[in-house]
């Protein structure tokens, strides 16, 4: 290859980098629920309609797998993780196997439940294995907070409502016309990503004898943006 040709190729390479860097500022990635699913999708419309009628809190789930069966060590670890999660300002509440009422072994009544007068795996004198068996066979708890094999449990993290996100969703067209939509969306994405980082740090600093899996729409949105950004960066470098 001649020196002149090398100079020309180098010139075009530098020019393309300048061009890309100039316009990349206007590139936005939206991984909200209404962008991950087509807004014209009938199932999504149906879900959104009933979500407005019967609102539920956004949630994340940490699945925890034991190398053997669920034991007292795991129960104690769940309690430690739950307390750390509950201290996060973004978290409304946490539900785990530790908070699940024992219903059948001690004939807990609806009145007992209403008065918060019930036993859990933390305060019960009933045999530990019997409690796990009840939970694993329960239509309420099975495959929710415990699996049939009794080696996987979960922590359900209910998140506080994000007033900015609700306002943005309800007034999307207005903010788009005002040119404010992507600025507010970026702030919301940043807050969500920070929350995911906090939760992952809690997991990393937990007992690594167990295996942890973090899931949920908020986590998926965060990861989608990260993956796409990394792919774009890699592609731009290759090109």
Across the structure, where does each feature detected by a protein language model lie?
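Signature of alpha-helical transmembrane segments and their immediate interfacial
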Residues: 1-29
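Hydrophobic C-terminal alpha-helix "anchor/cap" residues
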Residues: 2, 85-86, 203
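Solvent-exposed, non-transmembrane loop/terminal regulatory segments of multi-pass membrane proteins
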Residues: 24-68, 75, 122, 129-146, ...
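Extracytoplasmic
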Residues: 52, 76, 125-239
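Short beta-strand elements
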Residues: 59, 89-101, 142, 208-215
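Short amphipathic beta-strand/extended segments in non-transmembrane regions
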Residues: 65, 79-106
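Charged, often glycine-rich, active-site loop that binds/positions anionic groups
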Residues: 79, 104-122, 225-233
């Amino acid at each position: 290859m001649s020196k002149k040709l090398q100079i020309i190729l180098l010139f075009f390479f530098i020019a393309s980098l300048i061009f890309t860097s100039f316009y990349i500022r206007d590139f936005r990635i939206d991984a909200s629920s209404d962008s991950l699913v087509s807004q014209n999708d009938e199932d999504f419309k149906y879900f959104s309609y009933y979500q407005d009628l019967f609102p539920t809190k956004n949630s994340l789930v940490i699945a925890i797998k034991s190398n053997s069966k669920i034991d007292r060590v795991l129960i104690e670890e769940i309690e430690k993780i739950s307390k750390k999660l509950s201290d996060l300002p973004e978290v409304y509440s946490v539900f785990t196997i530790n908070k699940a009422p024992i219903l059948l072994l001690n004939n807990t009544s609806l009145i007992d439940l209403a008065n918060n007068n019930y036993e859990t795996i933390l305060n019960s004198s009933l045999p530990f294995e019997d409690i796990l068996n009840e939970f694993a066979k329960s239509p309420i708890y099975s495959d929710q907070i415990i699996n049939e094999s009794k080696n996987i449990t979960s922590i359900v993290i209910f998140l506080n409502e994000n007033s900015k996100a609700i306002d943005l969703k309800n007034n999307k067209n207005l903010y788009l016309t005002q040119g404010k939509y992507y600025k507010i969306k970026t702030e919301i994405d940043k807050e969500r990503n920070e929350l995911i980082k906090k939760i992952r740090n809690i997991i990393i600093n937990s007992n690594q004898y167990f295996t942890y899996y973090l899931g949920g729409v908020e986590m998926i949105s965060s990861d989608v943006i990260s993956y796409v950004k990394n792919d774009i960066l890699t592609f731009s470098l290759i090109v």
